[in-house]
């Protein structure tokens, strides 16, 4: 498997997805996985599909064509990237109440959402003095990169976003009826659902970046790029740089926070055991458990290296 050029596809679609069809698609994807090197994560719900998958191009094509038959060949938002290595261990398929959890069942992006803004027009919108820009991602994602002058709601998860809107959004608006509200996220799904929430609450000029940060970085040359830092992704790569290559961050396997090269040089950092974000979060028993886990990981790496050399 080493040296293969893997295709990584992030995709989502909001559409009415019936229970029997969800189970049918799940079973067909498992069949494809059994016969091919397919990995990633799918989340299915009655509101649609959300997922990121990794495989060779021909396998990806099979999966996309299959999914399109369930979405009636429309509204499947796709972002493509490549990697020399697999970015997931295996394929996971989860069936949930929502494909991205906001916790408000009546929010339905397939019926009413904000206005899509493509990458080419995004810079103009966010430079407009009558526009506020909101990063709808989690605080640890925002911490490693975001758009210039964007507002950070500082949420731990997306389900906290509605409360932030109720408590804080109006304080950022000069006029609820005339101020532009531009929102973005990694691939477009969270900001799309966020626009539906705001439209339901009566906000009028609501926009979201089509395809999210990933599409923007793919479309806009570096010299015109207004995104600063790296973009967090939910796979082994941890973060992507401005060229959509693997970035400089790693994950602290104790707390899950992204840690930079500089963070790893701090005295608090112990690989797999703790970082400066979580040094006060865990007990000594926890750390002993983390240390043993890291030793097992290191042993497996050595064994796998020997196998490949042979």
UniProtKB/Swiss-Prot annotation:
SUPFAM superfamilies: Rhodanese/Cell cycle control phosphatase. GO terms for biological process: tRNA modification. Its EC number is 1.14.-.-. It comes from the Bacteria. It holds the Pfam family Rhodanese. This is tRNA uridine(34) hydroxylase. Belongs to the TrhO family. NCBIfam families: PRK00142.1-4 (NF001136). The active site is at 185 (cysteine persulfide intermediate). InterPro entries: Rhodanese-like_dom (IPR001763), Rhodanese-like_dom_sf (IPR036873), TrhO (IPR020936), TRHO_N (IPR040503). It comes from Prochlorococcus marinus (strain MIT 9301). Catalyzes oxygen-dependent 5-hydroxyuridine (ho5U) modification at position 34 in tRNAs. It catalyses: uridine(34) in tRNA + AH2 + O2 = 5-hydroxyuridine(34) in tRNA + A + H2O. One of its GO terms (molecular function) is oxidoreductase activity, acting on paired donors, with incorporation or reduction of molecular oxygen. Residues 127-225 form the Rhodanese domain. Keywords: Oxidoreductase, tRNA processing. The lineage of its organism: Bacteria, Bacillati, Cyanobacteriota, Cyanophyceae, Synechococcales.
